[in-house]
Amino acid sequence: MDRTQKEATVAALNSSLQEAGLIIVTKQSGMTVAEVTDLRRKMRAAGCSFKVTKNRLARIALKGTQFETLDGFFKGPTAIAYSKDPVAAAKVAVDYAKTNDKFQIVGGGLPGLKLDSQGVDALSKLPSLNELRASLLGMIQTPATRIAGVLQAPGGQVARVLAAYAKKDEAA
């Protein structure tokens, strides 16, 4: 890679990291190309990105972002996973680490907060932003559906009584 390619890589990575809500630093030494491709596919499906980068370039790309404190994690063969959703990348990475012992989570970070591997594991157990929105919407809608049910119940009872009288009159 020549200097202009490195500068372009750093600039692209820096702009991606500026928008990220979570970054996870991983070690994946010994993983096959098929395994890395499978991990990338799972990350992409969850709305995340996974990149194997040179440590020096990753450290440079972190400068000027909210994740500058993570530069100590970049030792040895590392890769980064990042996403806008603060939980999505953690869920995929932790699930993948459970099934593949060559893949290890070194640490990660939220904007302004450095996490170790246990912190990333704890973060993966939280509900995602979409799950929180869905449960909040469900909580908001539940009282309205109960009120509608209560209001419809007397009308339904009157209709059933009238139908019973109509059947009784037809039979007589």
Curated annotation (Swiss-Prot):
Q: Which HAMAP family match?
A: Ribosomal_uL10 (MF_00362)
Pfam families attached to this UniProt entry: Ribosomal_L10 (PF00466)
Give the SUPFAM superfamilies listed for this entry: Ribosomal protein L10-like
Q: Which organism is it from?
A: Rhodospirillum centenum (strain ATCC 51521 / SW)
Q: Which NCBIfam families match?
A: PRK00099.1-1 (NF000955)
Which terms under GO biological process does the entry name?
A: translation
Q: Identify its protein family.
A: Belongs to the universal ribosomal protein uL10 family.
What does this protein do, in the record's words? Answer: Forms part of the ribosomal stalk, playing a central role in the interaction of the ribosome with GTP-bound translation factors.
A molecular function (GO) term: large ribosomal subunit rRNA binding
Q: Which GO terms describe its cellular component?
A: ribonucleoprotein complex; ribosome
Alphabetically list the UniProt keywords: Ribonucleoprotein, Ribosomal protein, RNA-binding, rRNA-binding
| Quaternary assembly | Part of the ribosomal stalk of the 50S ribosomal subunit. The N-terminus interacts with L11 and the large rRNA to form the base of the stalk. The C-terminus forms an elongated spine to which L12 dimers bind in a sequential fashion forming a multimeric L10(L12)X complex.
Name the UniProt record assigns to this protein: Large ribosomal subunit protein uL10
Entry-linked Gene3D superfamilies: 3.30.70.1730, 6.10.250.290
